[in-house]
């Protein structure tokens, strides 16, 4: 039975305990996904490792360790990748949720988590990389916004199983792709005035 506050709202107490018990890895200084079938953590660098910051389920010390251990491996030219580069030993066919692809929901949740724990500079660096990539791709290509990007190359061009909605002319949704549109608005709102001016100059140039 869920724990509840006196006002009837669900309590996060049990959730926090579960996150700490199953997802936190003190040795590696990060949270990991947990494989319930195996009963063990997946020791793999992924954007989801930063999600406990968004949910407010970690201490300041854990947040610092997680940002230090995970963000450098995930932050690319065009924003935060879904995963770190996958080694040749475990990689199969290129999948859209793997490196080097980045998705708007990941960016938004991680920005909010970084901001929540006071990592403003890191948040703005990540948002600037993502927003700048979208602006370049939009102005240089078809004027609209696709669902995902290759953040390593900073490009809308992908070669994965389901293609890229909005990146080919016979499948361009009117008005762009919802969550990518939202990430552009939310990302711009988080930038410094200097970063916004740099993006304005970029849009005028390309």
Regions from the PLM with identified roles:
Residues 14-102, 135-206:
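Extended glycan-interaction surfaces of carbohydrate-active proteins
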Residues 105-112, 121-124, 128, 182, ...:
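Feature representing long, continuous alpha-helical segments
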Residues 1:
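Conserved, charged catalytic cores of large soluble enzymes
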Residues 48-60, 107-120:
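Alpha-helical support elements that line or immediately flank enzyme active sites
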Residues 7, 26, 122-125:
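Alpha-helix N-cap and coil->helix boundary residues
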Residues 4-6, 71, 110:
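Intrinsically disordered, low-complexity segments enriched in glycine/proline and serine/threonine
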Residues 5-20, 127-130:
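Short amphipathic alpha-helical coiled-coil/interface segments
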């Amino acid at each position: 039975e869920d724990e509840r506050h006196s006002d009837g709202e669900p309590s996060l107490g049990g959730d926090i305990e579960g996150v700490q018990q199953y997802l936190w890895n003190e040795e590696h200084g990060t949270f990991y996904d947990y494989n319930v079938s195996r009963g063990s953590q997946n020791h793999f660098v992924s954007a989801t490792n930063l999600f406990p910051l968004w949910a407010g389920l970690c201490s300041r010390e854990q947040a610092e360790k997680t940002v230090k251990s995970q963000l450098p491996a995930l932050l690319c030219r065009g924003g935060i990748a879904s995963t770190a580069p996958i080694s040749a030993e475990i990689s199969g066919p290129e999948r859209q949720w793997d490196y080097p692809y980045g998705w708007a929901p990941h960016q938004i949740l991680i920005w909010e988590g970084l901001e929540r724990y006071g990592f403003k500079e890191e948040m703005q660096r990540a948002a600037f990389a993502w927003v700048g990539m979208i602006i370049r791709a939009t102005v240089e290509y078809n004027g609209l916004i696709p669902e995902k990007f290759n953040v390593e190359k900073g490009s809308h061009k992908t070669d994965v199983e389901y293609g890229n909605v909005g990146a080919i002319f016979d499948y361009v949704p009117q008005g762009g792709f919802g969550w990518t549109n939202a990430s552009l608005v939310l990302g711009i709102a988080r930038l410094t005035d200097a970063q916004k001016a740099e993006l304005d100059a970029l849009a005028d140039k390309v």
